[in-house]
């Protein structure tokens, strides 16, 4: 070896800095290290086409609709009993394993923000692929790989994992409620999801007070899907466990009956794995060495698989027939008295007292061995809790009711985050309308044409409603949309129904006035021709278009805001009030609204809202600046209305925000509201909130604001505002391919 080579040995090969320093791409001290509280705008630019190997023209719906669904189902049925030496199937059947995989893919969903769930296939990526609750599910996905490889682009990983769970149930004698495709894979972790602040797996710093779980979280510990099966904090208290179950399953949109059905149905199958000390289990997939090729949790006990498998740490099966649908779960739960014991791994679990049923359960891999059934603390909670107990007893006595409830709850679990039925694909979609799907009536009439739209616009313009009223009402209707679970939006006109009509952010008194005027216009139009109708949902959005067009005209721009009819009006009976309550914004920075005081800053909540609306940073900037000058704040607040000509679509917000003649001062120690004073005279010129000033404070947002503040940017601003506005108005138009 030459002296030159010897002198370079062990040094970094990348010339990004001084020779020999460790500055390869992506390493080194980051901005986040220097400024940990820096506003995270990266969540607005996730899932770039550059990260997607399928290409921008890839149409997954088209590909899925060309899939031979029955053929892939038969392949999945065959896989269930095709045990592999590298990961042998318990009881010779992979069904329970795939149920757990599908459940844990879907079970991260939470109602508070609609994030998590199965719809993006993110169990493939960190952190989910390495959560303690997902131990060994890397093997389940590898078992599926030959099928994924065979069918390629015709089925996403997200759909395949759920379909495998359905086929697993069916292969063991259970009749499922249905299956819908349509889940589109992402190609990187979802950075917008808040999983908690804990730095250690299974920590539970998310609780305060009397075990109050932090919002929007829906799991008791970092790295768990729901609850600790041993009991809260590992303590085998069944009633305390029931409280955790009710809280976490409720946050995942399940009521008490659905919760009991899911736990009982899921635990009818398979077994838990805790053959030995968890210290024998190696690094998770994300931390494992490169030679492991994405496999994690290497187990040094015995063969490291089969009888030696260590996953949850609990050990055993719930029923005597772990690969068949029956009523064995409730039979065991109610027909035995249970005593506390520990698994070989040291985890708390329960077995029948006095050795009862000691040989009723077959061994998963050795036909010469028999075992007693086991229950988790979270299972006995279904017997001991005063609310769960009668539900459990009813299912025990009426197995047909359990079967129906589990089928429906499983379908809800695995489809809750897919949005409305309009997004469902395939021949197995059930026909029954379910209220949690936020149903909207089909459009069975002729919709308005171009001339009708012009006539309706003229009537709205002559109605006496102001630009601010029209714009704020349309925004209130459409901006409930959440890209996380595809709920909300203008379609359905649910803004006229409970609970949305009563939300403070929607200014109920003004809203009622605007809706009354629009309903009169709707009624007059619909009386003319019974075959041609306009929905209130369409009219609300069209009213917003009128407001924007009038405001643009006032600034010297003649524009037409794109509008496509076809929305329908949902009924109150089609609207689950309790479920829709989760869509009420705690904050809407676009309307300068805060419902209360929060530990999260107003600007962070603005970015979070923008992310749920699938907006980019430029779209967020253009929209907020436009809504301010259109006077669309809640309560007509003048915070951020940096213009002397409100209801005119100008770039004044940006021009005046960046004016160095203004100096800003907080009005209190909380630094939530501010006054902008003339630097020379000290006279108050403007007032603002953090959601306004962040566009001058944050360097990235200021750079965008500067674009719109330039003297040659007025036309560009109007164009960009209208494009972003139209995007929000159509976010829930899944009928517009």
From Swiss-Prot:
CDD domains listed in its UniProt record: catalase_peroxidase_1 (cd00649), catalase_peroxidase_2 (cd08200)
Cross-link (Tryptophyl-tyrosyl-methioninium (Tyr-Met) (with W-103)): 226-252
Catalytic residue positions: 104 (proton acceptor)
Pfam families in UniProt: peroxidase (PF00141)
Reported modifications of this chain: Formation of the three residue Trp-Tyr-Met cross-link is important for the catalase, but not the peroxidase activity of the enzyme.
Its EC number(s): 1.11.1.21
GO cellular component, one term: cytosol
Keyword Zinc: no
Bound cofactor: record note: Binds 1 heme b (iron(II)-protoporphyrin IX) group per dimer.
Site for Transition state stabilizer, residues: 100
Source taxon at top rank: Bacteria
GO molecular function: catalase activity; heme binding; metal ion binding
Compositional bias ranges of the Polar residues kind: 20-32
Protein name: Catalase-peroxidase
Organism listed in the record: Marinomonas sp. (strain MWYL1)
Organism phylogeny: Bacteria, Pseudomonadati, Pseudomonadota, Gammaproteobacteria, Oceanospirillales
């Amino acid at each position: 070896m030459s002296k030159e080579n010897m002198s370079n040995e062990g040094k970094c090969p990348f010339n990004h800095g001084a020779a020999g320093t460790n500055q390869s791409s992506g390493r080194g001290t980051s901005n986040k290290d220097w400024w940990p509280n820096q506003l995270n705008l990266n969540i607005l630019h996730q899932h770039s086409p550059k990260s997607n190997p399928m290409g921008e023209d890839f149409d997954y719906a088209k590909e899925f609709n060309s899939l031979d669904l029955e053929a892939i189902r038969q392949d999945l049925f065959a896989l269930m009993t095709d045990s592999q030496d590298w990961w042998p199937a318990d009881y010779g059947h992979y069904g329970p394993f795939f149920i757990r995989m599908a459940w844990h893919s879907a079970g991260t969903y939470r109602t508070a923000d609609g994030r998590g769930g199965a719809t993006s296939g993110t169990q493939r990526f960190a952190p989910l692929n390495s959560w303690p609750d997902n131990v060994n599910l890397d093997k389940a996905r590898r078992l599926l790989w030959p099928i994924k490889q065979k069918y390629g682009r015709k089925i996403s990983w997200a759909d395949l994992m759920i379909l495998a769970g359905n086929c697993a149930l069916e292969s063991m004698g259970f009749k499922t409620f249905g299956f819908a495709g349509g889940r589109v894979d992402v190609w990187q972790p979802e950075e917008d999801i808040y999983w908690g602040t804990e730095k250690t797996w299974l920590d539970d710093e998310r609780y305060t007070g009397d075990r109050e779980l932090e919002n929007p979280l829906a799991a008791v510990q970092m790295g768990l899907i729901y609850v600790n099966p041993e009991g809260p904090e590992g303590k085998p208290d069944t009633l305390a466990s029931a409280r955790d179950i009710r809280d976490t399953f409720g946050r995942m949109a399940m009521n008490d009956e659905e919760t009991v059905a899911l736990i009982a149905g899921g635990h009818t199958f398979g077994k838990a794995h805790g053959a030995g000390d968890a210290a024998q289990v190696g690094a998770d997939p994300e931390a494992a060495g490169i030679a492991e090729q994405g496999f994690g949790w290497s187990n040094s006990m015995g063969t490291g698989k089969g009888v030696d498998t260590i996953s949850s740490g609990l050990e055993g099966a719930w029923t005597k027939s772990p690969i068949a649908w029956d009523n064995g779960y409730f039979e065991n739960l109610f027909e035995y008295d249970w005593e506390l014991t520990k698994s070989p791994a040291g985890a708390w679990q329960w077995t029948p007292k006095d050795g009862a049923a000691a040989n009723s359960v077959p061994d998963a891999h050795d036909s010469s061995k028999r075992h007693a059934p086991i229950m988790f603390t979270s299972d006995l909670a279904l017997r001991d809790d005063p609310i769960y107990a009668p539900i459990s007893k009813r299912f025990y006595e009426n197995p047909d009711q359990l079967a129906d409830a589990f089928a429906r709850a499983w379908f809800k679990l695995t489809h809750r985050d897919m949005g409305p039925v309009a997004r469902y694909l395939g021949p197995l979609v059930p026909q029954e309308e379910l209220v949690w799907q936020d149903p909207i009536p089909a459009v069975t009439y002729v919709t308005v044409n171009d001339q009708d739209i012009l006539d309706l616009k003229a009537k709205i313009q002559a109605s006496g409603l102001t630009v601010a009223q029209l714009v704020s009402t349309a925004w209130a209707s459409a901006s409930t949309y959440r890209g996380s679970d595809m709920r909300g939006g203008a379609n359905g006109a649910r803004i006229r129904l409970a609970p949305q009509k009563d939300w403070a952010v929607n200014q109920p008194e003004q809203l009622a006035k605007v809706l009354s005027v629009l309903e009169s216009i709707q009624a007059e139009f619909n009386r003319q021709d019974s075959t041609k109708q306009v929905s209130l949902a369409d009219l609300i959005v069209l009213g917003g278009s009128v407001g924007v067009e009038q405001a643009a005209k006032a600034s010297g721009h003649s524009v037409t805001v794109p509008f496509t009819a076809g929305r329908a009006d949902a009924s109150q009976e089609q609207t689950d009030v309790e479920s829709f309550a989760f869509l009420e914004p705690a904050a809407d920075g676009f309307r300068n609204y805060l419902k209360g005081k929060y530990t999260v800053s107003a600007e962070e909540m603005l970015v979070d809202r923008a992310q749920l609306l699938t907006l980019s940073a430029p779209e967020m900037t253009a929209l907020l600046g436009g809504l301010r000058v259109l006077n669309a704040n809640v309560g007509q607040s003048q915070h951020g209305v940096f213009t002397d000509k409100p209801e005119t679509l100008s770039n004044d917000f940006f021009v005046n925000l960046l004016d160095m003649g203004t100096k800003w001062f907080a009005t209190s120690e909380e630094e939530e509201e501010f006054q902008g004073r003339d630097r020379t005279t000290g006279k108050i010129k403007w007032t603002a909130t953090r959601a306004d000033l962040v566009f001058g404070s944050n360097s990235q947002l200021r750079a965008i604001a500067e674009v719109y503040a330039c003297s040659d940017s007025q036309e560009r601003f109007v164009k960009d505002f209208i494009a972003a506005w139209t995007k929000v108005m159509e976010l829930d138009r899944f009928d517009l391919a």
